[in-house]
Each structure stands twice: as structure tokens, then as C-alpha cells.
Amino acid sequence: MAKQDNSSSHENTLTEMQRYVTQEHGTEPPYSGKLLHNKDEGIYHCLICRAPLFLSDSKYDSGCGWPSFYQPFSPEAIRYLEDDSHGMQRVEIRCGSCDAHLGHVFPDGPQPTGERFCVNSASLSFTDDNGNKTLG
């Protein structure tokens, strides 16, 4: 999949942090995200294209400082890339629809998957079961 440039269509609506995270592969400071402590039932979407990424049922408190999920909404929801930046070997996760940076996945999550999808709040929007929307 070719990387799409999402910045131009959202240039005037993204905050500096949202742009930094989704377009420049940045990371928000730990414990700073608006959706970290969200416990409402609903769906987490890509902030850029609104594709569904995670269900609230798969969210858990990993203690890492970012929203954590043990599985994506669907296998196609997430794109995986090797990330050797900062002297570490990690797996970057991006939106499977628009290629926006989301965070990283680690093999230290709970069952049933054993995976921890560590996601920047700034890359997400959340819609609760009543249709109310919150931006990360």
C-alpha cells in the first residue's frame, strides 16, 4: 500500500500534537492523552479517515501511559511495519485505510492474543454507543 499524504486534507483541523503523531510518526507524552482513561463502551476510530480500529471491549490498562488494546477491530484495520528507530526493534502500527501513524504493538499483552497495541490518543477518535464523539 502506498503512503497517502493525509496532512493537506486536515491541515487546518489537526492540532499540533495530532499532526505530529499521525503525519510525522511522533509519540505524545505518556499519561497525556484524552482517551487514556476512557472507560465508555464504543468504537475507537482513526482520527484521520474514521476507519474503525479498536473496540472498547479490547481496551485494558497496561500501565504504560497510552491507551492499550489486545486486538484490532479487524485484521485489515492495522498495517504493521518494522521500526528500528531510536536504537530499538519495534513494530509500528498504522491505520490500514489511510496509513496514519498510530503507535506500536508489543508481544507482552494479555490473552487471548498476547499483544499490546500501544496507541497514541492523538491518533484516535472515539464514538460511544450513544453516538457521542470524542477526539483524542
UniProtKB/Swiss-Prot annotation:
Domain of life: Bacteria
Note on how the cofactor is bound: Binds 1 zinc ion per subunit. The zinc ion is important for the structural integrity of the protein.
Coiled coil residues, start to end: none
All residue ranges annotated as the MsrB domain in the record: 7-129
GO biological process, any: response to oxidative stress
GO CC annotation terms, alphabetical: cytoplasm
Protein name as annotated: Peptide methionine sulfoxide reductase MsrB
Originating species: Erwinia tasmaniensis (strain DSM 17950 / CFBP 7177 / CIP 109463 / NCPPB 4357 / Et1/99)
